[in-house]
Amino acid sequence: MNGAVNNSKAHLLAKLCMEIEGGCAELYHCLSEIHRNDPHAARLWKKTALEEEKHRKLFELAVHLMDEVECEFVTANMERALIVHQKLHELLHIVKKNPPDLITALGKAIEMEKHIADLHVESLVHFKNEGMRRMFDALYRADQDHIGSLERYLASISPPPTGIPAM
């Protein structure tokens, strides 16, 4: 990174990403508890929560290594990250106040994961170190896996559209 200002912004962005991943984990743990009577749903929420905790730890590692490993955070995405952070915390507040049914929860989780995946696709962080780059590439792939898992489960429990016979 060039200059203390950019490095400071990069640290803020990395910490914001940590908070986003931690917030996602909290959301999914909450949904696992809300839907505990549906074992498949509870397991899916719990699995996703644990994966988000790993993502949080990955950003925490990036914060610690930022000054030691050549990396660059794209701080131009700060505003977008702040919006995702705000939307996530609004969703978490709503879920805690008014627990959603499973279909609504899945739809909102998919929407949030897509926002996060878009943020990650814009390459928030670039590493020159191959090992670090691979770890973050795995994070980006995991975003797509989360979306796919949630979408498949939603499709499996959603009723078919009216007027079209079920197959």
Where would I find each of the regions flagged by the language model?
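Non-heme di-metal
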Residues: 1-167
